[in-house]
C-alpha cells in the first residue's frame, strides 16, 4: 500500500469484513462474536459475558467519538495506526495512549478502558486507517452506553493535563475534526 492510501486500505477492509457505519460513535463496525456464557448484572438482567467487534477508522471517519460504557472495553490494534486513545476514568487522572506497533516510540497495540471511563479515539495521521478488534465485557448493550461527552465530565477534566484542552475535547466529539493536530 502506498503511503497516504489509508482510505484505499480502509475501503478494502470495510468490504472484506462486511462493515457498516457505527451510528453515534462513528467509524465502521460489525459484531463478530458473542459469548454463549451469560453473567448476571446487579439489576438482575443476564447478558452475554462478552461480545467482540471489528472497528475501522478511515480518513472519512477518523474519530470514534466520546462514549462511556458500563462494561470493560479491550481494544487491540490489528493493522494500521497509530491511533490516539484518550481515557477519562471516573476517578484519577486522564490519560492518553498511542495505539500502534512501535514500542520504541511508546506505542502499544492494546488499550483497556475500565467500565465507566469516557473514551475517544482518532487517527494520528488523518489520511491513515486503523483496524481494531474490541471485546466488551459484559457484552455491550445500547442502554448501558452513552455517546457524547457530558458537561460534568468535560468540566471535571478540561485543563487537568497540559494536553487536555477544550479544543481536543471538541475534536474528539466530532466525526470530522477541523483542527490541525
Where are these regions (language model features)?
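Non-catalytic, conserved peripheral segments adjacent to functional cores
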Residues: 1-111, 120-121, 127-128, 138-141, ...
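Histidine-centered acyl-transfer/condensation active-site motif
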Residues: 135
Amino acid at each position: 500500500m502506498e503511503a497516504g492510501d489509508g482510505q484505499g486500505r480502509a475501503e478494502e477492509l470495510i468490504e472484506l469484513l462486511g462493515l457498516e457505519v457505527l451510528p453515534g460513535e462513528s467509524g465502521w463496525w460489525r459484531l463478530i462474536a458473542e459469548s454463549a456464557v451469560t453473567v448476571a448484572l446487579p439489576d438482575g438482567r443476564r447478558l452475554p459475558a462478552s461480545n467482540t467487534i471489528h472497528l475501522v477508522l478511515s480518513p472519512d471517519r477518523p474519530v470514534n467519538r466520546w462514549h462511556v460504557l458500563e462494561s470493560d472495553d479491550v481494544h487491540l490494534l490489528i493493522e494500521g495506526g497509530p491511533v490516539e486513545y484518550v481515557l477519562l476514568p471516573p476517578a484519577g487522572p486522564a490519560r492518553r495512549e498511542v495505539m500502534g506497533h512501535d514500542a520504541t516510540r511508546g506505542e502499544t497495540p492494546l488499550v483497556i478502558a475500565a467500565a465507566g471511563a469516557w473514551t475517544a479515539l482518532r487517527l494520528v495521521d488523518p489520511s491513515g486507517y486503523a483496524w481494531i478488534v474490541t471485546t466488551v465485557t459484559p457484552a455491550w448493550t445500547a442502554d448501558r452506553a452513552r455517546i457524547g461527552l457530558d458537561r460534568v465530565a468535560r468540566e471535571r477534566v478540561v485543563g487537568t493535563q497540559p494536553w487536555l484542552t477544550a479544543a481536543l475535547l471538541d475534536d474528539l466529539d466530532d466525526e470530522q475534526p477541523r483542527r490541525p493536530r
